[in-house]
């Protein structure tokens, strides 16, 4: 019984540590978005692209919370917005 409980606990820990990268594509083959999950939480960079292949926006997540710079570009690649986050909260410069 004790071994079964320990085995279940270890299995739950391992599942929670597995990282999975999800990528979706436009019909023309260009990337649409890419994000990384750790268990049920976003964890790592999340990037969106325009259909022309230009980056649209990027933000990093840590344990399901925004963490780091959030950057938005227009279709020509010009940065049009930037915010910084720490532990899910916007940080003033």
Predicted regions and their residues:
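Glycine/tyrosine- and acidic-biased, solvent-exposed loop/turn segments at the edges of beta-strands
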Residues: 3, 13-93
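Sec-dependent signal peptide recognition
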Residues: 2-8
